[in-house]
């Protein structure tokens, strides 16, 4: 409905804005009942469906902390199930994710860009190299599959321009499938 699409009035530092921005990274039938967590771990809204929404920006804080994220795209929110967040926890702490089941996560607001080959490239030199190599992708709306066994993605394309689902971080323990949806390109 309208609440799903309409940005709330007020500052981007408010709980209301963050709940809207983070939860709308998934379709409304998931976002309406998901838990929403702030970047500091504070639960902004308790959910009931087993899905969680939070900012996925690896910088952890807005470029303008006083005024909050510029928009949902800068926040890079992700709405994922428990297995997706177990994967994300491993990813962010540099440990190997251990899941018995595949994880799923939505990022309908896209992201600010990634080196498709190597994770957590955030320095200017690394970004410039990825761009020069044609491996920098600023993703639009997508769904992600975090396989319990990343080797199940072996042989899938890594070509993010093909329009087909593609593997990001191929050959690493963090390999996952990016599934573009309408608005990706």
Region spans (language model):
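Short, small-residue-biased leader/transition segments that mark boundaries at the very start
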Residues: 1-4
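Extracellular/luminal recognition modules and glycoprotein regions
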Residues: 9-49, 56, 62-67, 161-177
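A short linear-motif detector with a strong N-terminal bias
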Residues: 14-16, 31-33, 83-86, 121-125, ...
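A residue-identity detector for tryptophan
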Residues: 17-20, 51, 69, 87, ...
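Residue-level detector of short, conserved catalytic/binding motifs and their immediate flanks
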Residues: 49-51, 143
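Active-site-proximal beta-strand/loop segments in catalytic clefts of secreted hydrolases
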Residues: 54-56, 148
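Mid-length scaffold segments of soluble, non-membrane domains
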Residues: 59-127
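Beta-strand-rich cores of mature extracytoplasmic or soluble domains
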Residues: 105-185
């Amino acid at each position: 409905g309208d609440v799903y699409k309409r940005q709330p009035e007020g500052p981007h530092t408010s709980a209301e804005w963050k709940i809207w921005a983070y939860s709308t990274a998934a379709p409304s039938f998931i976002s309406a009942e998901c838990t929403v967590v702030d970047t500091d771990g504070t639960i902004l809204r308790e959910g009931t469906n087993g899905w969680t929404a939070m900012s996925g920006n690896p910088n952890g804080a807005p470029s303008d902390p006083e005024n909050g994220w510029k928009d949902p795209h800068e926040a890079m929110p992700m709405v994922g199930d428990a297995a997706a967040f177990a994967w994300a926890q491993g990813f962010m702490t540099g440990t190997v994710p251990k899941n018995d089941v595949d994880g799923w996560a939505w990022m309908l607001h896209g992201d600010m860009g990634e080196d498709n080959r190597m994770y957590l490239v955030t320095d200017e030199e690394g970004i410039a190299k990825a761009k020069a190599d044609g491996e920098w992708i600023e993703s639009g709306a997508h769904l992600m599959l975090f396989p319990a066994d990343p080797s199940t993605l072996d042989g899938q394309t890594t070509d993010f321009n093909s329009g087909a689902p593609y593997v990001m971080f191929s050959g690493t323990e963090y390999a996952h499938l990016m599934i573009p949806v309408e608005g990706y390109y």
